[in-house]
From Swiss-Prot:
Protein known as: GPI ethanolamine phosphate transferase 2
GO cellular component, one term: endoplasmic reticulum membrane
Recorded name of the encoding gene: LAS21
Subcellular localization, as worded in the UniProt entry: Endoplasmic reticulum membrane
One Pfam family of this chain: Phosphodiest
Amino acid sequence: MGRKLYYVLATLQLVAVFLFCGGFFPQKVVLKNDSKFIVNPEVQLASKPVFKKLVLVVIDALRSDFLFQKDSSDFEFLHGLLNSGEAWGYTAYSNPPTVTLPRLKGITTGSAPNFLDAILNVAEDDTSSNLKEQDSLLKQFHTHHYKMNFFGDDTWLKLFPLEFFSEYDGTNSFFVSDFEEVDFNVTRHVPYQMEHQKNWDVLILHYLGLDHIGHKGGSKSHFMPSKHREMDSVIKQIYEKIDGDTLMVVLGDHGMNDLGNHGGSSSGETSAALAFLSKRLKKYQSSDIQQSSNVPVEDAHPDYKYLKEVEQIDIVPTLSMLFNLPIPKNSMGVIIDELLQLLPSKLAAIKVQDNYLQLTKLKPGYEAQLEKKSAGTLLEEMREIQSSLAMAATNYNYTFLTYGTTLMIIGTLIVTVWNFQLSQEYIEHVGTSVLLGISMFASSFIEEEHQIWWWITISVLLLMQISNGKKLVVLSGLRLIRGWNNSGQKYIYDNVLHTLLKSHTSVLWWLNVVTFLSVGFPFLRNKDESEKMVSLLSVSFLALSSITYKICFAIVNGDKVPSGLYTFALRSCAMYLANENATESDISQCLVPIARIFFQICGVSIIILLFMKYALNKSTNMLNKLLSVIKFVLLLQTSSANIPLFLIFEILTSVTPDITPIFSLCLQNLTFFQFGGTNSIATVNLTNAYNGVSSNYNIYVVGVLMFLSNYAPSIYWALSLIPQSYKQKTLRLQHYYITGTCLMIACIALRYHLFIWSVFSPKLCYYAAWSLYNVVMDFAITLLGVL
């Protein structure tokens, strides 16, 4: 296939993918204008709210067991309130995608999440998700002249106009290495706010530290208990200062899985904690389950369902009722029935009817009937309406879906016919592509895709024309890769090499040092003396700066490192800070500068290599040297416990230097999953997305770093096939055409499937990201003239 046709087809694939995504992830259509009271508006307008003030404390990723289960919870003060009846607890079901932006939309508007919000969740400067024109709980508070103060996650300041808040101070939600300062910057406002309660009617606090700990160390991190106690002390500090006319609500926006990630639909991710706190509640009866339970609960529930379960969006009509506000127009929530006790019976009945009529307006063609229906009957009917609305919350753009799928089918036919030949290589490629394509129609196969790639990789290895000795070495390496991390979304194993090495830090870190040095070896293969000197300096600076950064990063995050490396990092920071008395607390000041120095060295090294090649015509082994620089970047963007895997990669490439395109394709996919990646948003790793990024957030820099950190092993094996012929490239392109076409057809056919947003949609996003990388990399290599 000619070069021009290849690039036309590659571009066509990218256009088709983004056309399809544009139709599959449209902005949700919402009802405009603000809501008004529907049933007996004059009675409701004349009524007084149950509470005068609201304190809303959002603890990011507060899973239900963190609040209610003995082995997982250290909220002693809150436990006392739950047992005395001054607090009522619930497990709040958080609709996927379980990331902050869509969940805050759900908590404030009561509407179903839009998957596009999960993607925009990392776009700090994005304004397309703004709720200025959409009816919400905060807009109703603002309209009814409640003074609101906000402190915490600045996602709120993206969602709502600043004029909603009398006072505000945002903290950045994505610097996940920060456990303490990000919460201190919220808590420092609490004493003043408690002493000046006349200055606000609604106080919103959003804490991020617990979520950050989860991302770094998982749900059982040793930092968790102290963070629980810290949050509990904040709750106590506030509760002891407020009076009976103030309602306090403590909740998580979502939960997390055992690895500390979230975004998917597992029980841990969707089970968030919720508690209403008020001295008044003691006079009334909490849910039957709570009355018969002693908190914290002794038994651990694998489904994380503790006390009574409600929908998280039920907070919206419930708070609207308690503060006598109209329910936001797009709310799909249903009033939590226990809290109806706080209203006079006649007013409570009116509020339930109002909720019923408001909810039925969201379901076209539904005949609302109030006559002779009790509040209990209406609540039950509303639950059924709520379920049906959640199932049909998206409006697809079928024109874009049709165009995108049609272009993919056309491209698939062209590239398949053009490549057709009866050879082992072609049959292996087509067989792999068809097998993966068929798997796109089953949610379980997508969730456990790593299993498919494992068996395909082993099969391809056995068919390779290499000696049995080499096959044995490669097979051993693959088995180590396979056992390194937990993969997939259904099962978690305790005994993996990743966990074992983290408990033997000396072995881990010396393996890391050896890996960094091994990646630099191609630099040292030179014939010219001047090249040798330049190469030696480049390797030295790249290795030293990257190793120093990873050690400092580990120390700042509370990970153990060998004493020798600890001393080395401390002295390096002391030199940078020009402070001989630098201590461990000073190391954090060096992280951003060291990372930037590393990236600058990478840039200078590449410029020198290109200059020596094209200006002096004397660069030896230039391609491998450029790849070594890129490998150093990939190492920096990889978690410390995964870095030794690159040492195995180096061994495999030395054993099979002439890697076949199909084996490279297998390793690109297999290693992505064995690094801990999945087809779920929950495993998108943000830990290394901020290397070298200061408080001046740049979405494009963070986006590139995030891509590199999540696709590092795949990029390694994709680059291992350079240089490659256009015949080899078209076989790879054919694979992504076939699997992409099947994925698009599956998404259309299963668009109303239960797991469309938690399984199929994330897979589509991963596919689009990798397709973009392949096209950009192909164009970049061509422009550089490497091939």
